[in-house]
């Protein structure tokens, strides 16, 4: 949150930045604190104490591996081991891909230092009381890979659960359940399992196009959707389709996807969203726009349904969202 303020402070003292990313601000502070610290880990801790917001850091030195997680636990971070080597990574799926074993999560507010001499050392100076912790629920809904576990909760299982809740709370008659890839797929499978409506693939995804909702301009978001997704006509033609997506932020990409399904021959398109309506922007680093740009701002679900051109629209309730997180304290 306070990255702009910290950047100005550094520039005032002569710092010259090469990028606009927040990570460079953190790197500068770690470098400066190192001049007055007895160790690299102390410099990391002292730098992190100046930060307000969400972060998960990994810092390396010739003999040490240091990881730091913000006091609220917004962003995930975990430790793995392969043979005699340690790994610190944001998601457990990275450990699987290199044949490493999961050791444990880095706790909210923890700074861990790993060295050959002392193994894993923990500093909990920045830790907050448990009731103040707040995981970013968007990690489970959208950001994280489904084959990851965050703080002991399976991302895949949580998305399956969200889909089942949607089927129970927002049922509709249809011939096919499909997900908007990738993050909508598991929720769509969960909806299918709970409703008995067949699950199928309706979209082919271009894996070379990045995430669309974080594109800076509306025109680039819309063009990215068309390049990123193509509809399998044979899968949807003549069918009533339930389309599961992880969220609706501005609504323009949802409108485009609904039209693509109709153009491919779907007779009905029912949209189900595996998260509650977005009513507020995120102040902790996720590129969610000003409140006035959110489609759910000052609109009913029926009005949103009309805007995106769907036959019906249903969202996951906030209480269901908490159930999906299996009791973890979350930021919503």
Regions found by a protein language model. Give the residues of each.
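Extended, hydrophobic alpha-helical segments in both membrane/secreted and soluble proteins
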Residues: 1, 6, 177, 184-191, ...
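Conserved short alpha-helical segments that host acidic/polar catalytic motifs at enzyme active sites
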Residues: 2-107, 113-174, 180, 268
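Secondary-structure transition/capping motifs at alpha-helix termini
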Residues: 15-18, 36-37, 169-175, 193-200, ...
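A conserved beta-strand->alpha-helix junction
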Residues: 19, 24-27, 199-210, 307-325
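Phosphate/diphosphate-binding loops
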Residues: 46, 94, 101-102, 106-110, ...
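PRPP-dependent phosphoribosyltransferase catalytic core
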Residues: 48, 63-64, 69, 99-105, ...
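Short, glycine/charge-rich flexible loops or terminal/linker lids adjacent to PRPP-binding catalytic cores
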Residues: 196-242, 252, 279-289
């Amino acid at each position: 949150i306070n990255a702009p303020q910290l950047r100005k402070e550094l520039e005032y003292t002569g710092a010259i930045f090469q990028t606009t990313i927040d990570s460079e601000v953190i790197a500068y502070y770690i470098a400066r604190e190192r001049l007055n610290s007895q160790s690299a880990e102390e410099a990391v801790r002292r730098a992190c104490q100046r930060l307000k917001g969400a972060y998960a850091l990994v810092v390396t030195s010739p003999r040490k591996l240091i990881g730091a997680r913000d006091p609220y636990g917004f962003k995930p971070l975990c430790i793995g081991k392969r043979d005699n080597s340690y790994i610190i990574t944001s998601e457990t799926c990275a450990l699987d891909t290199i044949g490493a074993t999961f050791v444990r999560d880095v706790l909210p507010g923890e700074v861990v230092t790993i060295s050959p001499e002392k193994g894993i050392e923990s500093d909990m100076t920045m830790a907050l009381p448990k009731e103040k912790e707040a995981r970013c629920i968007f990690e489970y809904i959208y950001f994280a890979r489904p084959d990851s576990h965050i703080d002991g909760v399976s991302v895949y299982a949580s998305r399956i659960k969200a889909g089942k809740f949607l089927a129970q709370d927002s049922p509709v008659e249809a011939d096919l359940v499909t997900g908007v890839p990738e993050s909508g797929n598991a929720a769509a499978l969960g909806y299918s399992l709970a409703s008995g409506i067949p699950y199928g693939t309706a979209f082919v995804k271009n894996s070379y196009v990045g995430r669309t909702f974080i594109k800076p301009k509306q025109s680039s978001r819309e063009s990215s959707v068309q390049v990123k997704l193509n509809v399998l006509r044979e899968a949807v033609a003549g069918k009533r389709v339930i389309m599961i997506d992880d969220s609706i932020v501005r609504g323009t990409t949802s409108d485009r996807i609904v039209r693509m399904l109709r153009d491919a021959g779907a007779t009905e398109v029912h949209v189900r969203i595996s998260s509650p309506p977005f009513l507020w922007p995120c102040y902790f680093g996720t590129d969610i726009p000003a409140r006035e740009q959110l489609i759910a701002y000052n609109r009913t679900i029926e009005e949103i349904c009309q805007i995106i051109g769907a036959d019906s629209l249903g969202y996951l309730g906030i209480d269901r969202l908490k159930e999906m997180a299996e009791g973890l304290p979350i930021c919503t």
